[in-house]
Swiss-Prot record:
Lineage: Eukaryota, Metazoa, Chordata, Craniata, Vertebrata
Gene3D superfamilies named in the record: Helix-loop-helix DNA-binding domain (4.10.280.10)
Alphabetic keyword roster: Nucleus, Repressor, Transcription, Transcription regulation
Pfam families cross-referenced by the UniProt entry: HLH
CDD domains (UniProt xref): bHLH_TS_bHLHe22_bHLHb5 (cd18954)
Protein's name according to its UniProt entry: Class E basic helix-loop-helix protein 22
Record localization: Nucleus
């Protein structure tokens, strides 16, 4: 009797277990049109990853809704889609960690030791892919090193050229300060670059203005020397001019200037030489004329 009761309890246990397994299988079965099999992108250590609490919560909610009816089935499909997205993202991060560990030559230990050998094939394929990636990336790394070295050399050359240019500019400005007045006096501190250039500009403009005034004066003197000495204005002015010329011959250059204001002739004979000018006036002694006294 007890044995029959035990068999009945065992049959009931197995039946309930199989029913639970079927319900779990139906809950985890992907809907139509959704393919979760991605052997190329899955992590080789996906069998060691622990379940995500959020995924378990979603599965529990989905199982509860599946038992309630068709509305629960629709929620299960949405939950499975979200779970698939989370699992893909998690597997992508795991694959990235594994590729980094394999490229660095280290070995990543699994926290669990109860593996049943289902990931061996995936591990081998991932190892082959990692080795192929290392072989392909090796020339790229060499080329990147050469490129960075060339860029560093180019940057150093540009910096050296700019440094030489600044040194030449500073030397030129120092030479300019040395020749400009008021730029190197003890009471004035060292001028800046802009102040030096402005002072040089003003100094050049001042020199140009002075040169222009000098040219006008020379032209005026040349024009006065071309006028004939016959245009002496009046006897008094002629006497004063003759006396001035007798005292100093260089003052004869200013005689035509007076004639410009008085263009009328006085009727006096033209005197071209110093003795003739001295002979025109009897009241002026010829001994005062330097040219007459210097002649033998």
């Amino acid at each position: 009797m007890e044995r029959a009761l035990n068999l009945a309890e065992e049959d009931l246990f197995h039946k309930s277990l199989s029913a639970s397994a079927k319900r779990m299988e139906s809950a985890f079965r992907p809907p139509q049109g959704l393919d979760l099999s991605q052997p190329g992108d899955r992590s080789p250590l996906h069998c060691y990853d622990g379940p995500d609490p959020s995924d378990l919560l979603r599965h529990h909610q989905h199982h509860h809704q599946a038992s309630s009816g068709a509305l629960g089935a629709a929620g299960a499909n949405e939950a499975l889609a979200l779970a698939a997205a989370n699992m893909c993202a998690k597997f992508g991060e795991s694959a990235g960690r594994v590729s980094v560990a394999e490229s660095s030559g280290g070995e990543e230990q699994s926290p669990d030791d109860d593996s049943d050998g289902r990931c061996e094939l995936v591990l081998r394929s991932a190892e082959h892919r990692a080795q192929a990636g290392l072989k392909v990336d090796a020339p790229c790394a060499t080329g990147g090193g050469k490129k960075s070295k060339e860029q560093r050399t180019l940057r150093l050359n540009i910096n050296a050229r700019e440094r030489r240019r600044m040194h030449d500019l500073n030397d030129a400005l120092d030479e300019l300060r040395a020749v400009i007045p008021y730029a190197h006096s003890p009471s004035v501190r060292k001028l800046s670059k802009i102040a030096t250039l402005l002072l040089a500009k003003n100094y050049i403009l001042m020199q140009a203005q002075a040169l222009e005034e000098m040219r006008r004066l020379v032209a005026y003197l040349n024009q006065g020397q071309a006028i004939s000495a016959a245009s002496i204005p009046n006897p008094a002015a002629a006497a004063a001019a003759a006396a001035a010329v007798a005292l100093h011959p260089a003052l004869g250059a200013y005689e035509p200037a007076a004639a410009v204001g008085y263009p009328f002739s006085t009727g006096l004979p033209t005197a071209t030489s110093c003795p003739d000018k001295c002979a025109l006036f009897n009241n002026i002694s010829s001994s005062l004329c330097k040219q007459c006294t210097d002649k033998p």
